[in-house]
């Protein structure tokens, strides 16, 4: 019984040590990525800004058509298109 308890304690100790070492390694990796992230973020924001501006411009000019609410003062039109 004492041998199995010691074996279980040794396994538990090894698991704890492994989790501590992996946690330390992950924290180091996170620090490295956060140090590099601001530089990468500025470059990627500049690349993303151009397509987003084009997309917004197209969306604004795209008409949205729905059933007429008589906002265009043409009660017989049936469909209103707003830009």
Swiss-Prot record:
A GO CC term assigned to this protein in UniProt: extracellular region
GO BP annotation list: defense response to bacterium; defense response to fungus; intracellular iron ion homeostasis; killing of cells of another organism
Membrane-spanning intervals of the chain: none
Stated name of the protein: Hepcidin-2
Origin superkingdom: Eukaryota
Tissue specificity: Highly expressed in the liver and to a much lesser extent in the heart. Also expressed in pancreas.
Listed Pfam families: Hepcidin
Physiological role: Seems to act as a signaling molecule involved in the maintenance of iron homeostasis.
Family: Belongs to the hepcidin family.
Position of the signal peptide: 1-26
Main subcellular location: secreted
Residue ranges of the propeptide: 27-53
GO molecular function: hormone activity
InterPro entries reported in the protein's UniProt record: Hepcidin
Disulphide-bonded residues: 65-81, 68-71, 69-77, 72-80
Organism of provenance: Mus musculus
Gene: Hamp2
Protein location: Secreted
């Amino acid at each position: 019984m004492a041998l199995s308890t010691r074996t279980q304690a040794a396994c538990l100790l090894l698991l704890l040590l492994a989790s501590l070492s992996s946690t330390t390694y992950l924290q180091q990796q996170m620090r490295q990525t956060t140090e590099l992230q601001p530089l990468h973020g500025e470059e990627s924001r500049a690349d993303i800004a151009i397509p987003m501006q084009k997309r917004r411009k197209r969306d604004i000019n795209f008409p949205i058509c729905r059933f007429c609410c008589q906002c265009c003062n043409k009660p017989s039109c049936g469909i209103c298109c707003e830009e």
